Amino acid sequence: MADVIENSPALDVNLDEENYFDDSCHIDTPVTGKTIFCGSSKEDVEYAKVFWKSITLQPPMESRLVSGDTRQRLKVASASFQPKNFAHEPVPDSPRLTQFLEEAHRQEHVEETEKRRQLSIKKEQQQLLLQKQREERMQREEILRGHKPRQRTELIHLPTSSDEEQEEDPMLELDKFEQAKGLQDLDSD
């Protein structure tokens, strides 16, 4: 929020009532008169107005009709006058029920310990498998360290004008070969 300026007679500015309310820049308070919120948004001013309107001061103790003092409270009735409430007393359990509940509790405990044992066995198996895989990987890495692959260097062959002539030469040679073969085929008939 912006600065809060409380009006005093020295700071009282002659503003007409409409302009003063249009700015939404003030709040009337019961304690100090008017409070001006300069530079505050209208939303902040509305929140402040609601806040100041919601504040109610409690009257002094002398003017209250009822006091919170313990002397005005009613006395508590003695326990001897109250009938015994059987609804809140625990019902005694039968021996069969007690034995059944104890057995069920033991069975749950046994099942839980078995489950934990199975989980620990499974965890150990997973750790052994990871260890085995790690050892195999390390063996493969050792084998690869001893064997270094040859680096392949490929020569890039750029075509030149002599290459074009060479390409034509095989074509001519192929034509000559086909002609010679054609003559041989005719001779073989």
Curated annotation (Swiss-Prot):
Region span, Disordered: 144-189
Protein name: Cilia- and flagella-associated protein HOATZ
Source organism superkingdom: Eukaryota
Taxonomic placement: Eukaryota, Metazoa, Chordata, Cephalochordata, Leptocardii
Record's compositionally biased regions (Acidic residues): 162-172
Family: Belongs to the HOATZ family.
Biological process terms in GO annotation: cilium assembly
PANTHER family linked to this entry: CILIA- AND FLAGELLA-ASSOCIATED PROTEIN HOATZ, UPF0722 PROTEIN C11ORF88
Compositional bias per record (Basic and acidic residues), positions renumbered to this chain: 144-155
